[in-house]
A protein has these predicted regions:
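Core structural elements
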Residues: 148-165
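Amphipathic alpha-helical segments within well-ordered protein domains
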Residues: 160, 171-174
Length: 193
């Protein structure tokens, strides 16, 4: 699946497929983007913003996540709050910039090869246990947390979204070839925590 001319939202965070993100929108270009997405029942791509030489010069990662808005509200601080669901990872091509500074691009869905979920999950019972403990934690807001414990993709993406990893570490998990590679990388990160 390829979508042409889709809005990009470069952020200092990585949104992982199957997970939810709450965002506060304040820049006019992104408020307009949200309005347009709501009117057209379409989504946008969250991509990692990469810092370059100085604060005003940044790059956009070529891999991101297509998201759809599932909730919005006006926050007490006057900002627009939105909750997005991350649908799938994408490869970004042909980036252009509109007059208002909003970036648009072509986005092609990246589908991981099928794996033997049960075999992968059996290799990583420690990761499943950590995720189960986190999901059961009383401070966990599980309003949008829907983990499929029979899916290596779901387990790896949700666990990565809940533990303290850097944006670059999360980006490496997003860019992993498949769930097997992602679980191995995640396991190595957890050993360092």
């Amino acid at each position: 699946m390829k979508k042409n001319n889709i809005p990009l939202f470069p952020l200092g965070l990585v949104s992982l497929p199957g997970t939810m993100q709450s965002l506060q929108i304040f820049e006019p270009r992104y408020i307009n983007m949200v309005k347009s997405c709501m009117q057209n029942n379409s989504g946008f791509v969250i991509t990692l913003s990469t810092q370059k030489n100085n604060e005003t010069n940044y790059g956009i990662s070529k891999n991101g996540t297509y998201v759809e808005i599932i909730d919005f509200n006006n926050l007490p601080n006057g900002l627009l709050g939105i909750t997005v669901k991350s649908i799938h990872k994408v490869k970004i091509n042909n980036i252009t910039e509109l007059d208002d500074g909003l970036h648009m691009a072509d986005a092609e869905a990246l589908i991981d090869p099928e794996v033997d979920d049960q075999a992968i999950l059996a290799e990583h019972p420690d990761l499943i246990n950590i995720l189960m403990q986190l999901v059961k934690h009383p401070k966990m807001n599980d309003k949008y947390l829907k983990v499929d414990f029979n899916s290596a993709d779901s387990v790896s993406y949700h666990l990565a979204g809940l533990i303290p990893l850097t944006s670059n570490e999360k980006q490496s998990l997003l860019e992993a070839f498949d769930a097997n590679q992602r679980m191995k990388i995640l396991s190595s990160y957890i050993k360092k925590l």
